[in-house]
Amino acid sequence: MIVDAHAHLWFAPSFSLDEFLKWTTKFGIDKLCVSKLTPTRPSNISGFTEANRDVAKAMKDYPERILGYCYVNPCYEEEALKEFRRCLEEHNMLGLKLYTDCRCLDPRVSPLIELAVEFRAPILIHTAHLQRRYIGALQPFHGNPLTVSTAEEIGDLARRHPKATFIAAHIGGGGDWEWGIKALRQPGNALLDTGGTGVDLGMIEMAVRELGAEKIVFGTDNVLCAGFAKIYGAEISDKDRERVLGGNMMKLLQRRGTP
């Protein structure tokens, strides 16, 4: 069983879900855990609500393949919490997706975490540790890179909320991956996903060595070739590879009670 813990729905006409599913089938992915972001950030209430509707529709259209994360902007506090609860109760979404709308240690995130704990729902957080010279280049895309959460902050968050399960997103797409891995060594409830375009030699091996394979989940962030190459090319045991590719995420899905 191969589970992609970090995938996205994007926007037509450049993205076709049917076409994307064909490619994921060719790569052998059994289940996709997807979220949809808004075209511009920070997102507003109508934006993230519409994005979640699209995810819910995809789940309904492809119930055997697609599971959904609820994406919200925590800055909208009450409305964000209401939307997250709706996604959990009405659509049985697997968890919460947080992006760059605010940093993960913002107090407004705490009620969302408490709700996630209630439903045993994992929390996937966009993560990066960027060198200063890259910040300006990323400005047009991220809107405000100063609100990007770091692995160190996620580790801190995990210690504050020991009953929650956090996933630090795309270790291969967040800048200094070695720093990120080291920051997640201590808390047992903070995992990382392997997504991103980075395929640096030794990245996956270091993650397994420092964190243990049980704290790593496979993610592509829709970058399929690089996503698989770094896992199959890594010098790790077959047992650890199986855990990363799907075993660990299946445990989270079973704990949540999603198909």
Regions found by a protein language model. Name each.
Residues 1-8, 16-31, 85, 206, ...:
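Mid-to-C-terminal alpha-helical segments outside catalytic/metal-binding sites
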Residues 94-95, 109-215:
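Catalytic pocket-lining loop regions of alpha/beta-barrel enzymes
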Residues 2-5, 33-36, 69-71, 97, ...:
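Active-site neighborhood of phospho(di)ester-bond hydrolases with catalytic His/Asp-centered motifs
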Residues 1-13, 52, 56-70, 185-188:
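Mobile, glycine- and charge-enriched loop segments
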Residues 10-13, 39-42, 74-78, 103-104, ...:
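Active-site environment of divalent metal-dependent phosphoester hydrolases
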